[in-house]
Amino acid sequence: WWADWAAPGRGPYDDPDIMAAVAKFVEVGTKSLACPDRSPAADLAVIIDEPSFLYEGLSRTLDWPLIYRQRHWGLSRTGAPYDLYLLDDLEKLPRPYRCYLFLNAFHVSAAQRKIIDSKICRDGALVAWSYMNGAISDTLHPDNMSDLIGMRFRWDMTAWSLNMLLTGFDHPITQD
C-alpha cells in the first residue's frame, strides 16, 4: 500500500520511475492473489499482543526492546522467515509451526492459556518466551508465568534497563 499525501503533482511519489515501480508491485501483488497455495512457508510464528500495551507504564519503554528491536535487529539477522500474529489470533493459525516466539504477552487470559497449552505447546514445538509473558491473569504474580511457561519464577524489583538481543555475531548463523 502506498499513499502520496502531498498536493497533486508535488508529492514524493511524483516521479515516473517511482510510479512505474509501484505499478509493477501492484501487478505482482495482484497476480500473487491468484496463486493456488498462498499458505505461510515460515517455521517460526512470532506472537505479539496489542492489549498488553495497556499494562505498560505511560512511558511505554517496553515496546522498543521487546518488539521493535527484536523484529528489526534480532529476527532479521536469523535469516529465517517468520510469520507475525496477534495473541488473539492463536486459535486461527493456519497450521502448526515448529517454533513460537512470544514477545510481549504480559496478560494472557484463561482461554488463551488453554489454547497455548493445547495447540502451541505440543508435537515437539519450541516455544520461546521473552520478558514477563503471562505475568498477568486475574492478578499480577510470578506464579502466573510459572503456570504458563512451566518454570518457577520470582521477582526482583531492582530497577534496570531491559535489553534482550541476539548476541555473538561471530557465530556463522548470525554473521552478515
Language-model features, listed with the residues they occupy:
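Hydrophobic targeting/anchoring helices
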Residues: 1-70, 155-176
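Conserved, mostly hydrophobic/aromatic
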Residues: 44, 82, 100
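Alpha-helical scaffolding within the catalytic cores
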Residues: 27-33, 85-89, 114
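A short, well-structured beta->alpha microelement
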Residues: 74-93
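A glycine-rich, often tryptophan-bearing local segment used as a flexible ligand/cofactor-contacting loop or short
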Residues: 106-175
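Short catalytic/ligand-binding loop motif for oxyanion handling, primarily in non-cytosolic enzymes
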Residues: 8-11, 53-56, 92, 109, ...
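Structural motif
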Residues: 47-51, 87-88, 103-106, 130-133
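Short, well-ordered secondary-structure micro-motifs within conserved domains or adaptor modules
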Residues: 94-106, 145
